[in-house]
From Swiss-Prot:
Signal peptide: none annotated. One of its GO terms (molecular function) is diaminopimelate decarboxylase activity. Belongs to the Orn/Lys/Arg decarboxylase class-II family. LysA subfamily. The lineage of its organism: Eukaryota, Viridiplantae, Streptophyta, Embryophyta, Tracheophyta. The keyword Plastid applies. Homodimer. InterPro entries: Ala_racemase/Decarboxylase_C, DAP_deCOOHase_LysA, De-COase2_C, De-COase2_CS, De-COase2_N, De-COase2_pyr-phos_BS, Orn/DAP/Arg_de-COase, PLP-binding_barrel. This is Diaminopimelate decarboxylase 1, chloroplastic. It is found in: Plastid, Chloroplast. Substrate binds at R343, R379, Y383, E412, Y440.
Length: 484
């Protein structure tokens, strides 16, 4: 099986139409397109010496954010004024992406991986928009799956099954049978998971390529809700149980082929030496596995690289920084590297766009109330996560700058998008965006309070606007009860 990333090209067919709603005189009219889906169904180095990169001379382009304020005070996405987009689409909260930024983010990983046999597996859980998946697949990406439906969606988007990795601590037998039939990699997470994979192999009549998910117990220094590789995690196996799993694989040669080892430390990681520390341990496990006669050829270091949510000018690790910490380790053992980026591929490509409903004060608290909410974007409420917030247009000259909680209309005190944000007092109807909303935002959206999931658009390379997901409607909700 070829492990290096393949570069596929399959253009989507476009069916453009101009939205009919009028724009204000000071705005230009922006056509919004609707996509019609096109569907297809050993050299030895010492571990200590190996952690220093030999690729540091590579020139990396400085990151230039796709959403930025211009000197005129307006927010632009790839040169297109966000306020103009708001006036050209349905008046409701929506997600707005930069398609070119998605491409640039993936290219950064591909550049970093030059010279390393690799699979870039996009973590579908971060954002499962079908058009985004098709775009990433067309650029040569693989997919990382944590449910049977994510596997089905990956197949619908045209991903090569041999570049897909099925993760999860509770994979069902039905989903494992599908994975076995399609030939995807499966990460073994527990004793019962291994038994189910064996059964799935027998049902499907196909041998399953498996990796062992081993917890290296390296502290990722992140929020406990997104730490996944410590000794008490619900994911993976403890290293002291490794021999039991190796013996079980040996006992089932027709059903299982052990091809690699996997770890996943967590998410929003901002120190790449943490990945290095984990990779050093994983190499030790791989050496032991090979000593027992297994032809292990893959090291999967997971994902989790963080981004600059604060927009405070922090210098964060790049994909090149990440890969350089493990490059020589991987090459020293002649391994194929699998990485599982999600947030770092898609988060900074998107804003959540809202209208200001009004401003109010209670006691010592000032509130900006918007039409978006925790139903559409739950990260701040769930993790107390910070996402940068700003207005899309210049405020009135007399607008006072003060501290606001930015809140939505959902009937929960936890319904906030940001707390204690210094912002100019906005007029009613003003546009307000929550930045870096491409990952774990729309994919975690709900219909709480019957807030229907919003539409999604992206800015194309030529500056045109394309709808990439329809808004959900009240009629969509009622359809679940038809015929009952």
């Amino acid at each position: 099986m070829a492990a290096a990333t393949q570069f596929l090209s399959q253009p989507s067919s476009l069916n453009p139409h101009q939205l009919k709603n009028q724009t204000s005189q000071r705005s230009r009219s922006i056509p919004v397109l609707s996509l019609k889906s096109t569907l297809k169904p050993l050299k030895r180095l010492s571990v200590k010496a190996a952690v220093v990169s030999q690729n540091s001379s590579k020139t990396v382009t400085k990151f230039d954010h796709c959403f930025k304020k211009s000197s005129d005070g307006f927010l632009y996405c790839e040169g297109t004024k966000v306020e103009d987009i708001m006036e050209s689409v349905e008046r409701r909260p929506f997600y707005l992406y930069s398609k070119p930024q998605i491409t640039r983010n993936l290219e950064a990983y591909k550049e970093a991986l030059e010279g390393v046999s690799s699979v870039i597996g996009y973590a579908i859980k971060a954002n499962n928009n079908l058009k985004i998946l098709e775009h990433l697949r067309s650029l040569g990406c693989g997919a990382v799956l944590v449910s049977g439906n994510e596997l089905r969606l990956a197949l619908r988007a045209g991903f090569d099954p041999t570049k897909c990795i099925f993760n999860g601590n509770g994979k069902s037998l039905e989903d494992l049978v599908l994975a076995a039939q399609e030939g995807v990699f499966v990460n073994v997470d527990s004793e019962f998971d291994l038994n189910n994979i064996v059964e799935a192999s027998r049902i499907s009549g196909k041998q399953v390529n498996v990796l062992l998910r081993i917890n290296p117990d390296v502290d990722p220094q992140v929020h406990p809700y997104v730490a996944t590789g410590n000794k008490n995690s619900k994911f993976g196996i403890r290293n002291e149980k490794l021999q039991w799993f190796l013996d079980q694989v040996k006992a089932h040669p027709k059903e299982l082929k052990l091809v690699g080892a996997h770890c996943h430390l967590g998410s929003t990681i901002t120190k790449v030496d943490i990945f290095r520390d984990a990779a050093v341990l994983m190499i030790e496990y791989i050496d032991e596995i090979r000593r027992q006669g297994f032809e292990v050829s893959y090291l999967n270091i997971g994902g989790g690289l963080g981004i600059d949510y604060y927009h405070a000018g922090a210098v964060l690790p790049t994909p090149m920084d990440l890969i350089n910490t493990v490059r020589e380790l991987v090459l020293s053992r002649d391994l194929n590297l699998i990485i599982e980026p999600g947030r770092s591929l898609i988060a900074n490509t998107c804003c959540f766009v809202n209208h200001v409903t009004g401003v109010k004060t209670n006691g010592t608290k000032n509130f900006i109330v918007i039409d978006g909410s925790m139903a559409e974007l739950i990260r701040p409420s769930l993790y107390d996560a910070y996402q940068h917030i700003e207005l899309v247009s210049p405020p009135p000259a007399e607008a006072e700058v003060t501290k606001f909680d930015v809140v939505g209309p959902v009937c929960e005190s936890a319904d906030f998008l940001g707390k204690d944000r210094e912002l100019p007092t906005p007029p009613q109807g003003a546009g307000l965006v929550v930045h870096d909303a491409g990952a774990y935002c729309m994919s975690m959206a709900s219909t709480y309070n019957l807030k229907m999931r919003p539409p999604e658009y992206w800015v194309e390379e030529d500056g045109s606007i394309t709808k990439i997901r329809h808004a959900e409607t009240f009629d969509d909700h009622l359809r679940f009860f038809e015929g009952l």
